[in-house]
């Protein structure tokens, strides 16, 4: 081998981690979809908080299924449900969950949009929104469930208990999805390209 022959240099980025631009964009789209769902849930809760008297026909539709599943001894009347509704409003459960999810949906919308454009700050905004939704959603659902435990009976009690669990699970999933671009190395590199690492060659 010719000693004067130049030695081929190893590319500095041969073993570098490649950025993944598709992952953060996919997460952004999922967060936008979740933001729309949260917005409609928040809109419904805020509407319930502002509704002093429920329509008898609407209450009848709500009670039709649970009352039909019992033997008639534990049927819930329209007046009982209205009493529960008033207690849930006075507890602040509807308001806490509604306005909390509204803030969460706005932050998820902004954060998801920023992730689509590969802005790393969007993941942090979305994660904070999901955390707010998780806390306020569970707390508000527990307040509503407490009112249900006091004034309702039968199948509806299970319904409001399941709602609490579902709210917590959905918001925990949103938080997990929002955190993915911050945890995954390739996704984080796409969001923060200035942190790219190169392999250094030292000549002997």
Describe these PLM feature segments.
Residues 2-204:
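Topology signature of small-to-medium multi-pass alpha-helical membrane proteins
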């Amino acid at each position: 081998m010719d000693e004067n022959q130049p030695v081929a240099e190893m590319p500095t980025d041969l073993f570098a981690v490649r950025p993944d631009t598709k992952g953060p964009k996919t997460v952004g789209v999922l967060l936008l979809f979740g933001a729309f769902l949260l917005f409609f849930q928040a809109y419904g809760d805020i509407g319930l908080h502002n509704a002093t008297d429920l329509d008898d026909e609407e209450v009848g539709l709500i009670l039709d299924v649970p009352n039909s599943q019992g033997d008639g001894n534990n049927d819930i009347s329209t007046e009982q449900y209205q009493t529960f509704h008033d207690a849930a409003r006075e507890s602040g459960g509807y308001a806490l969950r509604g306005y909390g999810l509204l803030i969460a949906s706005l932050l998820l919308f902004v954060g998801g949009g920023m992730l689509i454009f590969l802005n790393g700050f969007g993941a942090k905004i979305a994660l904070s929104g999901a955390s707010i939704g998780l806390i306020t959603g569970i707390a508000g659902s527990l307040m509503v469930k407490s009112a249900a435990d006091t004034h309702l009976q039968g199948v509806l009690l299970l319904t409001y208990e399941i709602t609490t669990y579902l709210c917590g699970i959905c918001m925990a999933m949103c938080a997990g999805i929002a955190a993915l671009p911050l945890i995954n190395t390739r996704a984080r590199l796409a969001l923060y390209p200035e942190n790219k690492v190169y392999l250094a060659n030292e000549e002997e």
